[in-house]
Swiss-Prot record:
PANTHER family referenced in this protein's UniProt entry, alphabetically: CYTOSOL AMINOPEPTIDASE, LEUCINE AMINOPEPTIDASE-RELATED
Pfam families referenced in this protein's UniProt entry, alphabetically: Peptidase_M17
Family the UniProt entry places it in: Belongs to the peptidase M17 family.
Binding site for Mn(2+) 1: D249, D326, E328
Keyword Manganese: yes
Paired cysteines (S-S): none
Gene that this polypeptide is encoded by: pepA
Cofactor(s) listed in the protein's UniProt record: Mn(2+)
Protein's recorded name: Probable cytosol aminopeptidase
A GO cellular-component term linked to this record: cytoplasm
Transmembrane segments: none
Keywords: Aminopeptidase, Cytoplasm, Hydrolase, Manganese, Metal-binding, Protease
Length: 483
């Protein structure tokens, strides 16, 4: 898909179709179209095609970035069925030129996303170009250089998000830990500024990553610890992302019910998001040093599977009582967080589809933010709102911390109560964060929006690419504050 900024007024631009935006359901200004609207009972909601005049009338609820994304997604999905190549539209400017143009591109590319590699009949579209006039929707003037930055940023962010979706949507037969390692290596080959290191099970044993290794015991596919890194010449901060990469989770001996096992290919969403983030960071050439530590494994059943009642000694030296083998992601993250802290980060963020409790509490569309530093949590939350991803803060408290105490080890991998499960999982991870990094750490539970078995907003069925846009947006904010 191409996005072209054109200096001409909208009427002077040649294209196969035109987008006409309707704000606040205000149809009074459309005198010529009055009869056409009445004939089609159109009241300014949704979309209306005028095939004779080659126009698509499109609701734009506001100039908020999310509404821009939703409108452009609707535009693409409506027009992709037609035999056209180009569309023209006015510029849509909200509070920020860069963000507005980025949102426009994101809406189109999210609308165009499909995971159809296993379909025998694939639907293709001839639509290949969006031509954006410098004539602004409300007659305002804007900086063209900022518009170009926005178009580029939107394309990079959307492509990185869709890259993440492809990883999450891929089937478990194909997508093993070795495949994740291969994708990480290919990512480094495609971008000379990204370095990739892959570590095998012998390295994990040497590093005493026993919790990580235990999860992998019953799988025929060996685990991999993946380290991706990017470093700008004038890096302002060192940021480390840790991603849960369960390429499939059966629950282990604490076997999931059949219905719950469906969609567990998506348990690699945290690692996939981290890969999408570093891809975007490198393409945007952000002045940062960014590392991604990914724990890739399966959690399967077998005669050599780890068991409830086991006690594991983690890389941090913290002993863990296993009371449920389906609480495996936190075991992998515990050792990966330990490894990540050796990199001495200024900011440490882990991402995981960690708990069903998070989905029960927040719904399918919202990720949870947790940590010890309220200012950091609030900054991230406010930044995430601008990215288009939904988040909320879940606060730690000492009473929930009591629930993960163990009588035979330093900590239990599940709580003694089923209530507050998202927070007790976060508190478990906090047990492995060293004192000097307590205030530099954020835990993101992306279990809801990482994968949904329905389309919503501009997200298609399946993977949502959760985590990519909100984290990259926060990194951009960090750099803005550093100036």
């Amino acid at each position: 898909m191409k996005f072209e900024l054109n200096d001409k007024k909208l009427d002077a631009i040649k294209a196969d179709f035109e987008l006409v935006f309707i704000q606040d359901k205000n149809l009074k200004i459309f005198n010529k179209e009055k009869d056409f609207f009445k004939l089609n009972n159109y009241k300014g909601e949704g979309a209306l095609l005028d095939l004779n005049n080659k126009k698509l009338y499109l609701e734009l609820k506001s100039l908020a970035y999310e509404d821009i994304r939703l409108s452009l997604c609707t535009a693409y999905k409506t027009l992709e069925k037609l035999n056209i190549k180009s569309v023209k539209l006015p510029s849509i400017i909200g509070d920020c030129v860069v963000r507005s143009f980025a949102s426009l591109v994101e809406g189109v590319l999210f609308g165009a996303y499909k995971f159809d590699k296993y379909k025998s009949e694939k639907k293709t579209s001839t639509l290949e170009k969006f031509i954006i006039s410098n004539e602004e929707l409300n007659g305002k003037k804007f900086n063209k250089d900022e518009a170009k930055i926005g178009l580029e940023r939107g394309e990079i962010l959307a492509n990185a998000t869709n890259f993440t979706k492809n990883i999450v949507n891929e089937i478990p037969e194909i997508y093993t830990p070795l495949k994740m390692a291969e994708d990480a290596q290919n990512l480094a080959k495609e971008n000379k500024n990204i370095i990739c290191k892959i570590y095998d099970e012998k390295f994990l044993a040497k590093e005493k990553m026993n919790a990580f290794l235990a999860v992998n015991h019953a799988s025929v596919h060996p685990p991999r610890l993946i380290h991706l890194s990017y470093k700008a010449k004038n890096a302002k901060k060192r940021v480390v992302f840790v991603g849960k990469g369960l390429t499939y989770d059966s629950g282990g001996l604490s076997l999931k019910p059949a219905d719950f096992m469906l969609t567990m290919k998506a348990d690699k969403s945290g690692a996939a998001a981290a890969m999408g983030i570093i891809k975007a960071v490198a393409e945007l050439a952000l002045d940062l040093e960014v590392h991604c530590i990914l724990g890739a494994t399966e959690n399967m059943i077998g005669g050599n599977a780890y068991k409830p009642d086991d006690v594991l000694i983690s890389r941090e030296g913290v002993s863990i009582e296993v009371r449920n083998t389906d609480a495996e992601g936190r075991l992998v993250l515990a050792d990966c967080l330990s490894f990540a802290q050796d990199l001495k980060p200024d900011l440490l963020i882990d991402m995981a589809t960690l708990t069903g409790a998070c989905v029960v509490g927040l719904g399918e569309f919202t990720s949870a933010i947790m940590g010890n530093n309220e200012e950091l949590q609030n900054d991230f939350y406010l930044s995430s709102k601008k990215s288009g991803e939904y988040t909320t803060i879940l606060h730690f408290n000492p009473h929930l911390r009591e629930l993960i105490k163990s009588n035979i080890a330093d900590v239990s991998n599940t709580a003694s109560s089923r209530y507050g499960g998202a927070i007790t999982a976060g508190l478990f991870l906090d047990k492995f964060i060293r004192k000097e990094y307590k205030d530099k750490w954020l835990h993101l539970d992306i279990a809801g929006p990482a994968y949904t078995e329905k389309s919503w907003g501009y997200s298609s069925f399946g993977a949502g690419g959760a985590g990519v846009r909100m984290c990259v947006n926060y990194l951009i904010q960090i750099l803005r504050k550093a100036k």
